[in-house]
Swiss-Prot record:
Protein name, entry field: Unknown protein CP 37 from 2D-PAGE
Additional detail: On the 2D-gel the determined pI of this unknown protein is: 5.8, its MW is: 44.7 kDa.
Gene source species: Clostridium pasteurianum
Upper lineage: Bacteria, Bacillati, Bacillota, Clostridia, Eubacteriales
Length: 14
């Protein structure tokens, strides 16, 4: 689902 970036992105995207 969060293939756009790393874990940092997951925090930003919620």
């Amino acid at each position: 689902m969060y293939n756009n970036x790393t874990i940092e992105d997951q925090g930003v995207k919620g």
